[in-house]
């Protein structure tokens, strides 16, 4: 009690402190217990997996708005990360804009405490089923705010739908859905929910049929209720249609209708207890919901009257109330014909307009935030409806105190700008319903929003307008204020023209309210304001006046910065004994490259409508000019994989100073960049100058100022589009090419000549100091020591080149391999070592963009040779930028590289060699390995920095030898691969003359062919490093989930997670056995569960195993292994105890078995598996590498695929087709056969003989008589189910066209169900047996077990 008192006191003080001026109230003990109970419950959006493909998101109605939005965003992000784009959300609660935007939810909601309509329930189940059938990974998410009852209804209905219609329903899934629904629809579930689920199940199974005739309600009788005053309200499709007078209940009370009330569809009854006094409120006694289309009526008299009797357990709210008499009943006297007079529903609504409106559900279709805005408007402008309310009260004979309590939105102080901001939706709120033609509007007391004023004096032609017009007499602040200029939209120019804004959540509107309240914002603050990316528009029309003011303010600040630029942006040169000064610009560059930098977490807007940061913002902003280019953010991604090499590569060079415009430069020869600069200054007369840090020549600084003032002043006179283009042009100029005269004039030519002379002298001094640099001299000495080793390896490589098998390097048109080529280029680079000028310029150009490998000609040697026209000093750039390919320690690459993990291979067995199609040309395998190696180096270049030439030359040696060794090791890859290698020339697989019949019994399968079940994989297709290399056919592409789990470089898309990052050489096993074939696709099943793994291995021999992704430990793997003996203390059973489970945990160094200290760390998952296939180590037994999928046998696979390839056909009798909507399964076949048989008996249809063929493409029907149709084809994706007649009826074949002697006279019936093209509904096609040797069961088994099984497997 002390804790409760303390909690109560703290709540009081919080109430007083947070809402000063309001009365502090006292919390009762009941309220305190309720609040404590709610506090103990989990708040926010909760995620619950009903099945592996059905998720429920729910949130209680008591959750605060802030907590709801935060948890909603978090839950949606988790689901999207787990399932990518394979999710779709159905919202069964009230529509909200934040749910639609964050989850992209489909609105299918209905009010709480009511059952959904049958139409809505059928639509949801059909959509769920269709979505799950589209892809095996598709996940359905059901969202509900306000409890789980509505989710439970949908789950239960979908469970019934699967039980009747679906073919691949799992017993576990059905049990999970049943258990979930019973938690909310069990003994305490509302009777109306159960009633509608029974309607739904009966309609699917065909036990009841839909009756679309209306019902006429004559009177309602209530018996055994306690004596109270009540009145009834009747809703049709949740719209109020009738309200009775107040009646005092007794033992038997009757509500007489003044005629008959016409009802059809979903009907909702409410019995409301009238208010006992004028100040008291009403309460609902009971409710009941039913559907007239599903009622089975039995007349009780000659007039056709029927009685629908509902007992206590069938009435909501009182079914479990012990205070109510158990004999309570409600009787509805109805008929299919109207009585003497029919009640006019419209008249009833007009007489009782107030009560039905306040108690209706018509506002449910509005979004919840829209409904809140509507309630605010009702509070703010209640004086508009004051007189109309009085008129309604006088016209209503029933006391207004009898109405129910309606939730009223929180009172909001009147503010004219609020309705204007949200006025775009007011036309949908039904505001006009409050102000009718006969309503009297009081005298106007102030400026009303345009959306409300247009309801008063709006023309007829504007009634259908979707968005409100902007009223001309609104004050300026009502339309927009100055602070709102920098937020994404501008009001329309014409006063009569509507404007449109993107939808935003309630939080966005709240932000805009706060921002609209800002006044007197200066232009400098506007210019420096960063616009959030979510507020920007992709297209903005002609800029308004405030746009120009922002541009002027920015340009003036730009000029001020230029006046100070020469002193702040001078280049620093170093000579012998000098230290290179660290510039602030390098910090900015590192911030761009770092993945966790601020610039990446908060990227600048890509559109011109975003904020432009001026030069006044920071000291180095002008140097980061490339960040102002919108394309930079469209292309930059720190985690993007390296791009494949283009046809031709352009190396851009440019200075890092804002004074020197840049231009693209193509290197066409192996020259020193200093020579290029000197030559360009003589030939072009560029007006560019660089100041000396030590000399500080004033004349050169003046030239800088004059040049830059002109360049930017010329730009300032351009349009905003040219201003953005200027940023790009400034990044694309260099001192080595002719100056773009768009940025210069003849008046600067004399100053440019002076700059040429000064620049030439400075560059010569730099080059002379570079020649005597001690670091360069020492590096040259070290590299010359390796020359002899290179010469010794040349002879061995040449000998290996001559010993290559036929059809390799020479056959592919490759040049002789020269390992010295790389060194010659490196030596040439050392003789032309670039100056700091060139290094600084190169660093300024890269900016952390994704690297691009060097191009290769089609006839290039497989060694890492640079293409013709590419300078050797390109290698020098690798040393100065971490985004360029760098040599690396080859411990990770040696014998452990997966070529197919980087490229997609196209295999054509008719070609003499395996080729890779990339960029429109064919590369041999040698060049393919070369490209793959280059791409791998780019992937790992960020973690490998080399500064010594010795390591660089050693890397060149390795690349030459590795490429040569890889080509030699792939000597079997160019063998001729033709179908004749596996099939005889006259094989039926290649050349079929006829389609075989359906197999009646299990016969001997066709001979085993690897191409039939293993996708063309064969034994000697090359070496496989670490079990993952192998031939090119042994791999799937990166997009295949079940491909090899071999990981390279710490990243893989083959599974949900990676098993290795960086590996330490001292603790990793590197020497792995070489395997001929990659078998990981058989033993690596990332998506299966623990139970599925047990079922897969239960009947397999010891040593059989499977690896899956662990669900309990994210990032880890689970190893399921079949052993020969159970663990100690476990009794033998059904075989599941023989399946042992081990956890493979990842670590920074690799993967290892958890809990096994004597186990080493393996660099990859494949390495662990293959090592344990040689020795058991800590496992109970050695792993046995599978030769086929453990889920199936090779014989089964080969027979299945061979039969599908050949197809099977026979002649049957086509009886007819029936549209069955979404029904499928045996129940569908039963009903369709009955319908078709009745049609044939009545002569409405004609049975004909057809040719029935089943193949991998689907089912094809050909009419043998050409009387009904010619040919019909049903795609394999459209076929859902096939089955025999459950009650085994017989069909008289003698009436069919094409019947002859020898055919079956009394034949059994069968059918298959297929989707109707371009529709979500199904059709059932019925057939009868015709040939004695081809029973219908053989056709059905072939469709289900061969065609549909293969479709599900693929």
Curated annotation (Swiss-Prot):
Disulfide bonds: none
GO BP of this protein: positive regulation of axon regeneration
The enzyme's E.C. designation: 3.1.3.48
Tissues and organs where the protein is expressed, per its UniProt entry: Expressed in ventral motor neurons, including ventral and dorsal D-type neurons, and in a subset of cells in the head.
Residue ranges, compositional bias (Pro residues): 408-417
Compositional bias of kind Polar residues: 391-401, 704-720, 734-747, 794-804
Biased composition (Basic and acidic residues): 821-843
Keywords recorded for this protein, A-Z: Cell projection, Hydrolase, Protein phosphatase, SH2 domain
Active-site residues (renumbered): 144
Record domain SH2: where: 1083-1187
Enzyme class: hydrolase
Location of the PTB domain: 1209-1353
Record's subcellular location: Cell projection, Axon
CDD domains in the record: PTB_tensin, PTP_tensin, SH2_Tensin_like
GO annotations of cellular component type: axon; cell junction; focal adhesion; M band; striated muscle dense body
Positions with biased composition (Gly residues): 1017-1033
GO function terms (MF aspect): protein tyrosine phosphatase activity
Domain Phosphatase tensin-type: 38-207
Region (Disordered): 380-442, 597-616, 638-660, 692-720, 734-754, 794-879, 1015-1035
Assembly, per entry: May interact (via SH2 domain) with receptor svh-2 (when tyrosine-phosphorylated). May interact (via C-terminus) with integrin pat-3.
PANTHER family referenced in this protein's UniProt entry, alphabetically: BLISTERY, ISOFORM A, TENSIN
Protein name: Tensin homolog
The species this protein was found in: Caenorhabditis elegans
Lineage of the organism: Eukaryota, Metazoa, Ecdysozoa, Nematoda, Chromadorea
């Amino acid at each position: 009690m002390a804790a409760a008192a303390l909690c109560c006191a703290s709540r009081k003080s919080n109430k007083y402190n947070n809402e000063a001026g309001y009365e502090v109230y006292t919390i009762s003990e009941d309220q305190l217990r309720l609040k404590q109970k709610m506090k103990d419950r989990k708040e926010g959006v909760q995620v619950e997996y009903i099945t592996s493909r059905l998720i429920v998101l729910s949130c209680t109605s008591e959750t605060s708005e802030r907590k709801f939005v935060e948890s909603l965003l978090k839950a949606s992000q988790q689901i999207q990360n787990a399932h990518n784009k394979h999710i779709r959300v159905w919202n069964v609660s009230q529509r909200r804009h934040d749910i639609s935007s964050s989850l992209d939810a489909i609105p299918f909601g209905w009010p709480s405490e009511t059952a959904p309509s049958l139409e809505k329930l059928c639509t949801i189940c059909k959509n769920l089923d269709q979505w799950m059938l589209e892809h095996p990974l598709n996940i359905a998410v059901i969202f509900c705010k306000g409890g789980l009852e509505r989710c439970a209804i949908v789950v239960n209905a979908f469970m019934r739908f699967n039980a009747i219609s679906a073919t691949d329903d799992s017993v576990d899934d059905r049990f999970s859905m049943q258990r979930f629904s019973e938690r909310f629809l069990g003994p305490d579930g509302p009777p109306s929910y159960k009633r509608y689920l029974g309607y739904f199940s009966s309609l699917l199974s065909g036990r009841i049929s839909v009756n679309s005739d209306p019902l006429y309600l004559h009177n309602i009788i209530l018996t055994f209720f306690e004596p109270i005053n009540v009145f009834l309200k009747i809703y049709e499709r949740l719209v109020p249609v009738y309200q009775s007078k107040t009646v005092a209940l007794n033992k038997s009370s009757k509500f007489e209708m003044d005629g008959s009330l016409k009802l059809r569809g979903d009907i909702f009854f409410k019995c409301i207890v009238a208010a006992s006094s004028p100040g008291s409120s009403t309460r609902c006694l009971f409710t009941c919901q039913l559907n007239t289309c599903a009622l089975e009526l039995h007349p009780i008299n000659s007039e056709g009257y029927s009685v629908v009797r509902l007992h206590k357990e069938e009435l909501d709210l009182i079914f479990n109330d012990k205070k109510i008499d158990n004999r309570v009943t409600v009787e509805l006297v109805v008929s299919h014909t109207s009585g003497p007079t029919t009640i006019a529903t419209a008249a009833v609504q007009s007489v009782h307009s107030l009560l039905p409106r306040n108690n209706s559900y018509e506002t449910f279709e509005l979004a919840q935030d829209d409904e809140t805005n509507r309630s605010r408007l009702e509070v703010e402008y209640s004086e508009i409806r004051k007189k109309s309310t009085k008129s309604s009260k006088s016209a209503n004979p029933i006391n207004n105190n009898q109405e129910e309590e309606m939730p009223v939105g929180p009172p909001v102080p009147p503010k004219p700008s609020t309705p204007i901001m949200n006025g775009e939706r007011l036309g949908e709120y039904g505001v006009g319903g409050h102000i009718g033609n006969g309503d009297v509007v009081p005298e106007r007391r102030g400026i009303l929003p345009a959306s409300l004023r247009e309801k008063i004096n709006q023309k007829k032609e504007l009634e259908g307008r979707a968005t409100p017009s902007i009223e001309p007499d609104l004050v300026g602040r009502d339309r927009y204020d100055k602070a709102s200029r920098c937020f994404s939209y501008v009001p329309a120019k014409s006063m009569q023209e509507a404007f449109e804004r993107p939808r935003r959540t309630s939080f966005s509107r709240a932000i805009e309210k706060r921002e609209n309240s800002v006044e007197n914002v200066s232009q400098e603050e506007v210019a420096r304001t960063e616009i959030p990316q979510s507020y920007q528009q992709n297209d903005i029309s002609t800029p308004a006046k405030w746009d120009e003011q922002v541009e002027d303010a920015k340009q003036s600040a730009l000029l001020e910065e230029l006046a100070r630029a020469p002193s702040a942006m001078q280049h620093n040169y170093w000579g012998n004994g000098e230290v290179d000064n660290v510039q602030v610009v390098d910090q900015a560059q590192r911030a761009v490259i770092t993945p966790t930098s601020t610039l990446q977490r908060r990227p600048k807007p890509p559109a011109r409508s975003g904020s432009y940061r001026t030069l006044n913002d920071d000291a180095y902003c002008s140097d980061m000019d490339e960040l102002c280019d919108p394309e930079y953010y469209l292309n930059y991604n720190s985690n993007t994989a390296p791009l494949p090499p283009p046809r031709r590569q352009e190396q851009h060079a440019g200075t890092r100073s804002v004074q020197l415009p840049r231009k693209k430069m193509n290197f066409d020869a192996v020259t020193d960049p200093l020579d290029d600069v000197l030559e360009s200054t003589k030939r072009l007369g560029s007006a560019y100058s660089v100041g000396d840090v030590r000399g500080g020549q004033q004349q050169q600084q003046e030239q800088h100022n004059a040049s830059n003032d002109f360049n930017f002043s010329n730009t300032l006179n351009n349009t905003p589009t040219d201003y953005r283009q200027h940023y790009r042009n400034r990044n694309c100029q260099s001192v080595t090419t002719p100056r773009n005269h768009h940025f210069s004039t003849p008046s600067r030519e004399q100053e440019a000549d002076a700059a040429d002379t000064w620049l030439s002298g400075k560059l010569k001094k730099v080059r002379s100091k570079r020649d005597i640099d001690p670091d360069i001299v020492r590096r040259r000495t070290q590299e010359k020591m390796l020359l002899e080793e290179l010469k010794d390896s040349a002879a061995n490589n040449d000998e290996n080149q001559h010993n290559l098998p036929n059809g390799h390097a020479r056959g592919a048109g490759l040049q002789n391999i020269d390992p010295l080529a790389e060194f010659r280029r490196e030596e040439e680079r050392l003789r032309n070592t670039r100056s700091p000028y060139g290094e600084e310029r190169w660093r300024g150009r890269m900016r952390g963009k994704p690297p691009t490998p060097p191009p290769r000609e089609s006839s290039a040697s497989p060694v890492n040779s640079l293409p013709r026209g590419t300078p050797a000093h390109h290698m020098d750039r690798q040393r100065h930028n971490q985004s360029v390919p760098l040599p690396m320690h080859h411990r990770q690459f040696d014998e452990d590289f997966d070529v197919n993990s980087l490229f997609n291979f196209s295999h054509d067995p008719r070609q003499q060699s395996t080729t890779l199609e990339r960029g429109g040309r064919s590369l041999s395998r040698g060049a393919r390995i070369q490209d793959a190696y280059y791409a791998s180096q780019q992937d790992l270049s960020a973690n490998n920095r080399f500064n010594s030439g010795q390591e660089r030359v050693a890397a060149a040696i390795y690349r030459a030898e590795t490429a040569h060794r890889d080509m030699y090791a792939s000597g079997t890859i160019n063998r001729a691969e033709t179908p004749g290698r596996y099939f005889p020339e006259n094989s039926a697989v290649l050349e079929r003359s006829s389609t075989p019949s359906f197999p009646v019994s299990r016969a001997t399968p066709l001979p085993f062919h690897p191409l039939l079940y293993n996708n063309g994989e064969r034994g000697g297709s090359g070496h496989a490093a670490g079990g993952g290399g192998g031939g090119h056919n042994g791999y799937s592409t990166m997009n295949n989930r079940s491909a090899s789990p071999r990981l390279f470089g710490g990243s893989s898309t083959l599974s949900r997670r990676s098993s290795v990052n960086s590996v330490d050489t001292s603790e990793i096993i590197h020497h792995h056995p070489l395997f001929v074939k990659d078998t990981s696709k058989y033993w690596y099943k990332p998506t299966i569960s623990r139970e599925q793994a047990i079922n897969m291995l239960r009947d397999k021999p010891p040593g059989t195993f499977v690896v899956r992704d662990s669900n309990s430990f994210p990032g880890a793997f689970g190893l399921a292994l079949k052993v020969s003996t159970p663990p100690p203390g476990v009794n033998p059973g059904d075989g599941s105890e023989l399946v042992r489970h081990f956890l493979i945990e990842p670590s920074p160094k690799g993967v290892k078995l958890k809990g096994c200290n004597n186990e080493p760390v393996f660099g990859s998952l494949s390495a662990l598996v293959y090592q344990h296939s040689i020795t058991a180590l800590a496992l109970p037994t050695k792993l046995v590498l599978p030769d086929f999928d453990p889920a199936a046998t090779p014989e089964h696979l080969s027979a299945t695929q061979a039969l599908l390839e050949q197809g099977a056909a026979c002649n049957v009798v086509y009886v007819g087709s029936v549209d069955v909507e979404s029904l499928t399964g045996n129940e569908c076949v039963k009903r369709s056969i009955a319908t078709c048989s009745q049609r044939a008996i009545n002569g409405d249809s004609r049975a004909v003989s057809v040719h029935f063929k089943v193949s991998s493409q689907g089912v094809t029907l050909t009419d043998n008589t050409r009387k009904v149709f010619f040919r019909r084809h049903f795609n394999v994706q459209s076929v859902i189910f096939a089955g025999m007649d459950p009650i085994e009826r017989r069909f008289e074949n003698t009436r069919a066209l094409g019947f002859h002697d020898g055919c079956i006279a009394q034949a059994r019936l069968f059918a298959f169900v297929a989707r109707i093209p371009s529709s979500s509904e199904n059709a059932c096609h019925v057939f009868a047996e015709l040939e004695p040797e081809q029973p219908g069961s053989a056709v059905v088994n072939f469709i289900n077990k061969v065609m549909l099984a293969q479709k599900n497997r693929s």
